[in-house]
């Protein structure tokens, strides 16, 4: 039948090949066309050719329909041909004879009679496509054994899908696909048969089955061999138990601190678990509205503190107008009403809420926090513009006692205040509060370069330490620059290197403000540089540092505070300045 079909279908095969090559530009061999024509269903032919042509629009659809029409016509001619029917009958008879030979061979095998039988050579069909290969394999398997189908959703089907690789490999099946070995007692990892018994792949702790654990507990030669076998890969894995390592002091301290925090957190969770019913109890629609103490993670002390603070603010807000204080100034003809303290409260953070957030509510107050219990005197603050202190000669004890008695405070308070005024030089160099002073050019650049050693002002400042220098927006004239350079050449010498440019409206660098002296004190203590300034008050500056990149900035009068971001960037851009002389 195959030979006759091939002979009768040769024109159709030739026609299909020519159409595919000329019309559609597909270089298709005749074997593929013969395979297409050997398909028994017209729908399968239409689907196959549609995939081959990648669509059925226009000429493609006409070619497919014409091919199916010619295929059906050719198939009818083959059926009507009596020669083909004879071929079919011969094939059926040959199949029956081969079956009878197989049955006879089995019977002879049972009776243990070895009779030589004629075996026809296997006629394997020509494999041209993957479909033919699958069909040939299916035919060969059907002769050998019966196919058994397994449901993939059953236990047996899941076992067939699971693949067990040789050796120990990480697996995340959690004992669902492979057999369970055990759980790691340190990290809790579920170890399956794929990972196998041995060191945990996460923490390195030994994990084995119950049978192996029983053998290890016997402490015999067999247990020693088993332990050596199980722990043989711990060196290669690079994971060793933490308890066996020698820790450095800072590592041990860090582990202890972490353990203490973990224990505190555990106690906190247990405490909240015990009191969860009382804390999560809802009264009416209380949870629908905001309340400061509604957070379930607050302790009893924090909750009571918040409730007390809320009552104070409510009384302050809804206080009677009769208790409001009004000041009548007859001399200035003004009526001053006391400001609402709520405005000040909303302009800053609440100390109670901030203490709860930082976890410092239960800590005792430090010495600086107890401002209401004992007076600390006047602390150094650049924002406090007070009268400058008078020069006191410490050699004369009588005058010192007289000055102490003349003051309104006691001797003990004055001595305590005097101690607060003492500032350590190392502390001044290490502390940088970001305070800045605006100076006109070209004096600002000379001050940052170290050529100008003092700065004169008409007001006193208690600030000591680092002081940033910002140039004002006013640009200097060339005449001012030349006159100032000539002056400092006379004061400092001819080998002074002056800056090439004098930028304005930017942050130049910083100096260390050592002292602020009056003109009289300045001439007494620094007679060699007294010619540089004749202002009422003189700032003594040392350690000048210039910035590599100047930041554009807008100045303010007197001493003012820099923006935090500009301050951080300025500290990173400082360079050490060489001395001018």
Curated annotation (Swiss-Prot):
The modification N-acetylalanine is found at residue 2. GO terms for cellular component: centrosome; cytoplasm; cytosol; neuromuscular junction; nuclear body; nucleoplasm; nucleus; protein-containing complex. The modification Phosphoserine is found at residues 276, 341. The modification Phosphotyrosine is found at residue 289. Disulfide bonds: none annotated. SMART domains: ASCH (SM01022). GO terms for biological process: estrogen receptor signaling pathway; positive regulation of DNA-templated transcription; regulation of DNA-templated transcription; regulation of myoblast differentiation; rescue of stalled ribosome; ribosome disassembly; ribosome-associated ubiquitin-dependent protein catabolic process. SUPFAM superfamilies: PUA domain-like. Residues 300-400 are annotated as: Mediates interaction with UFL1. The keyword Nucleus applies. Residues 200-300 are annotated as: Mediates interaction with DDRGK1. Gene3D superfamilies: Hypothetical protein (2.30.130.30). It comes from the Eukaryota. Interacts with the thyroid hormone receptor/TR (via the ligand-binding domain); this interaction requires the presence of thyroid hormone. Interacts with the androgen receptor/AR; in an androgen, testosterone and dihydrotestosterone-dependent manner. Interacts with ESR1 (estrogen ligand-bound); competes with UFSP2. Interacts with UFSP2; competes with ligand-bound ESR1. Interacts with DDRGK1 and UFL1; the interaction with DDRGK1 is direct. Interacts with NCOA1. Interacts with EP300. Part of the ASC-1 complex, that contains TRIP4, ASCC1, ASCC2 and ASCC3. This is Activating signal cointegrator 1. It comes from Homo sapiens (Human).
């Amino acid at each position: 039948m195959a030979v006759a079909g091939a002979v009768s279908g040769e024109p159709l095969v030739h026609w299909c090949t020519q159409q595919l090559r000329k019309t559609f530009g597909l270089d298709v061999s005749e074997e593929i066309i013969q395979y297409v024509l050997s398909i028994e269903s017209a729908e399968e032919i239409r689907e196959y050719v549609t995939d081959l042509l990648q669509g059925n629009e226009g000429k493609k659809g006409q070619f497919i329909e014409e091919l199916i029409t010619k295929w059906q016509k050719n198939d009818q001619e083959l059926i009507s041909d009596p020669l083909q029917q004879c071929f079919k009958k011969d094939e059926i008879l040959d199949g029956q004879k081969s079956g009878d030979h197989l049955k006879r061979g089995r019977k002879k095998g049972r009776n243990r009679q070895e009779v030589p039988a004629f075996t026809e050579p296997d006629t394997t069909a020509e494999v041209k496509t993957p479909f033919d290969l699958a069909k040939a394999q299916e035919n060969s398997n059907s002769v050998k054994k019966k196919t058994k189908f397994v449901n993939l959703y059953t236990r047996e089907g899941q076992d067939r899908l699971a693949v067990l690789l040789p050796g120990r490999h990480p697996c995340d099946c959690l004992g669902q696909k492979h057999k369970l070995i055990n759980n790691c007692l340190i990290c809790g990892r579920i170890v399956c048969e794929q990972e196998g018994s041995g060191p945990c792949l996460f923490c390195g702790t030994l994990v084995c089955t119950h049978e192996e654990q029983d053998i290890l507990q016997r402490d015999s030669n067999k247990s020693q061999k088993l332990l050596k076998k199980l722990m043989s890969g711990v060196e290669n894995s690079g994971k060793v138990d933490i308890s066996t390592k020698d820790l450095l002091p800072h590592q041990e301290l860090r582990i202890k601190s972490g353990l203490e925090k973990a224990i505190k957190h555990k106690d906190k969770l247990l405490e909240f678990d015990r009191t969860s019913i009382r804390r999560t109890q809802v009264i009416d629609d209380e949870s629908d509205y905001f309340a400061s103490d509604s957070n379930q993670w607050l302790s009893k002390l924090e909750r009571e503190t918040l409730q007390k603070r809320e009552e104070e603010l409510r009384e302050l807000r809804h206080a009677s107008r009769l208790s409001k204080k009004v000041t009548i100034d007859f001399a200035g003809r003004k009526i001053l009403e006391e400001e609402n303290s709520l405005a000040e409260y909303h302009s800053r953070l609440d100390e109670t809420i901030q203490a709860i957030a930082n976890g410092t509510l239960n800590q005792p107050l430090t010495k600086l926090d107890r401002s209401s219990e004992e007076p600390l005197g006047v602390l150094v603050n650049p924002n406090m513009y007070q009268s400058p202190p008078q020069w006191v000669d410490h050699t004369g004890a009588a005058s010192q006692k007289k000055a102490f008695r003349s003051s309104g405070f006691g001797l003990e308070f004055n001595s305590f205040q005097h101690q607060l005024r003492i500032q350590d030089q190392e502390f001044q160099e290490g502390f940088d509060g970001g305070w800045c002073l605006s100076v006109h050019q070209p004096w600002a650049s000379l001050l940052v370069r170290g050529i100008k050693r003092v700065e004169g002002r008409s007001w006193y400042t208690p600030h000591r330490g680092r002081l940033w220098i910002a140039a004002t927006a006013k640009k200097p004239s060339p005449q001012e620059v030349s006159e100032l350079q000539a002056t400092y050449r006379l004061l400092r010498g001819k080998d002074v290197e002056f800056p090439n440019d004098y930028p304005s409206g930017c942050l130049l660098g910083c100096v260390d403000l050592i002292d602020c002296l009056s003109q009289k004190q300045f001439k007494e203590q620094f007679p060699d540089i007294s010619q540089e300034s004749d202002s009422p008050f003189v700032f003594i500056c040392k350690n000048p540092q210039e910035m590599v990149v100047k930041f554009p900035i807008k100045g303010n009068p007197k001493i003012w505070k820099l923006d935090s971001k500009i301050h951080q960037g300025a500290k990173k851009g400082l360079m050490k300045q060489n001395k001018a002389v």
